[in-house]
């Protein structure tokens, strides 16, 4: 009985060590005290960029919105939840110290893992949608529509909430640590299962699927199409590379932690590496959520134009512009001329366009 009790105690200590370094609310709160200005600055920048993406899609692209736009919009929503969630949860912890740590523990884990799995689903569907447009073209236009994309989005959010449920329902704040509460029968293998699930479903599987679709699209464009779709591939390549790079330290730490749990060793050097990788990985995940819209701005030409147009429209709404009475006729004539030129240009582009009308997506 003594040996069994000692073994169970050792297993629970190992589980506590794992969960202590997975979004440890106490240690994150201590870091927040030193980097409070930087966290709020990144929150403001990330909120502005993600809201700009969402506004551009919902306002500027509302009439010609494509399934890709729907996935990008929800990806921005997932990033926005991560960006806004962290500083507000930590501010709540500062002003409500009695109940705050329990809320921070569950809240940060919920935002982090739900948005992680939801963002992965949206990235995969975004790559698959681009693959269908480039490789299959008009053959899948009946299947590929906004109603189906909206249904997929709802399914993905529900699936992300279910997949992330063990990460925030089974964690609680105990002895100033955010630890997992597992039964004795599952305390040995369930943390390893959670880490492996994140490694496979949240990192390896998306990279393999996105790399496969990207490879097929590149080969198809080089052999059969032309270079007008290369802008889309540039954006997708940057998105895939940034996803793999920013999430690598976090998933590496989970993988090393699973190995340490299975082997049962207590190596201080390995534990230090795991802790460092987890902190770096969580920081990079927050940075990526803030700067992910910048990828579309820097690489996507059409995205940059649409976002700039949205900014100008809202700037004109905020600043009242008055046209003198004698210039109204002149302005109307100029507007009629611009509309006529735009109609002729649109007719010419549709006639000589290298791709079917309606295939130019928000991502280009």
UniProtKB/Swiss-Prot annotation:
Membrane topology: Multi-pass membrane protein
Protein name: Envelope glycoprotein US27
An example Gene Ontology molecular-function term: C-C chemokine binding
Cellular component annotations (GO), alphabetically ordered: host cell plasma membrane; membrane; viral envelope
Intravirion compartment spans: 58-69, 125-150, 210-234, 301-364
Region Disordered, annotated ranges: 344-364
Gene: US27
Subunit structure: Heterodimerizes with US28.
């Amino acid at each position: 009985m003594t040996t069994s009790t000692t073994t169970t105690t050792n297993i629970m200590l190992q589980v506590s060590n794992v969960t202590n370094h997975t979004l440890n609310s106490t240690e994150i709160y201590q870091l927040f005290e030193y980097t409070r200005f930087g966290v709020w600055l990144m929150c403001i920048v990330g909120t502005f960029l993600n809201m700009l993406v969402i506004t551009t899609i919902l306002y500027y692209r509302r009439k010609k919105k494509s399934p890709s736009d729907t996935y990008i919009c929800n990806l921005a929503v997932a990033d926005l939840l991560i960006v806004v969630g962290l500083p507000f949860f930590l501010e709540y912890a500062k002003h409500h110290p009695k109940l705050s740590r329990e809320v921070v523990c569950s809240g940060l884990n919920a935002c982090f893992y739900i948005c992680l799995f939801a963002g992965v689903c949206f990235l995969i569907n975004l790559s698959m949608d681009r693959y269908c447009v480039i490789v299959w073209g008009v053959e899948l236009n009946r299947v590929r529509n906004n109603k189906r994309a909206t249904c997929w989005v709802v399914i993905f959010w529900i699936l992300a909430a279910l997949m992330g449920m063990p990460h925030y329902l089974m964690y609680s704040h105990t002895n100033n640590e955010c630890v997992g509460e597992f039964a004795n029968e599952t305390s040995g293998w369930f943390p390893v299962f959670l880490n492996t699930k994140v490694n496979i479903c949240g990192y390896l599987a998306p990279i393999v699927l996105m790399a496969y679709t990207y490879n097929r699209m590149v080969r198809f464009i080089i052999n059969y199409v032309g270079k007008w779709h290369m802008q889309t591939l540039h954006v997708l390549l940057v998105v895939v590379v940034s996803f793999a790079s920013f999430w690598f330290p976090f998933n590496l730490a989970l993988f090393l932690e699973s190995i340490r749990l299975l082997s049962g060793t207590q190596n201080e050097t390995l534990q230090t590496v795991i802790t460092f990788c987890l902190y770096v990985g969580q920081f990079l995940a927050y940075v990526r959520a803030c700067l992910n819209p910048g990828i579309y701005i820097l690489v996507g030409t059409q995205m940059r134009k649409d976002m700039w147009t949205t900014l100008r429209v809202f700037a004109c709404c905020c600043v009242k512009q008055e046209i003198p009475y004698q210039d109204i006729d002149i302005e109307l004539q100029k507007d009629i001329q611009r509309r006529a030129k735009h109609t002729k240009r649109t007719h010419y582009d549709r006639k000589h366009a290298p791709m079917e009308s309606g295939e130019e997506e928000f991502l280009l």
